């Protein structure tokens, strides 16, 4: 209980989330400046949501998804019936998704970025006063085309 109170107090410190958002904004600007016109990457989203845990290979051309292939669904336990109807993001859209997850005042996130391209490679977060709100995003095998 004591640790929970300290965590909530830490999250209530003004500037905690804005610092994360400023860092993310700097990486997003660097990504947008360096972003190739076409690229491929694999990613996985985990959350308390349908199709959580699936690995996708995403092809992007001119900042639009042109192909999304499900490459591994062995860890998926819910949402298999409509997994292929889910929209998949570009790397630019992952920044927007992470920022949206930081909107609640009690939200936190940790984001690691690719050192060359500056897109998120590993992000996780939670909203501490909501049940089942923990999420992760993992990006791997990025390749410029």
What does each of the following model-derived ranges do?
Residues 1-5:
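Positively charged n-region of N-terminal signal peptides that target proteins for export
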Residues 7-15:
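Bacterial N-terminal signal peptides
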Residues 21-23:
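Bacterial signal peptide processing site
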Residues 32, 59-66, 114-117:
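A short, structured loop/turn motif at beta-sheet edges
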Residues 34-45:
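A short, Trp-centered hydrophobic/proline-enriched beta-strand micro-motif
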Residues 44, 75, 80-145:
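Mature, soluble, non-transmembrane domains
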Residues 45-62, 67-70:
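Short, surface-exposed binding/anchoring microloops in extracellular/periplasmic proteins
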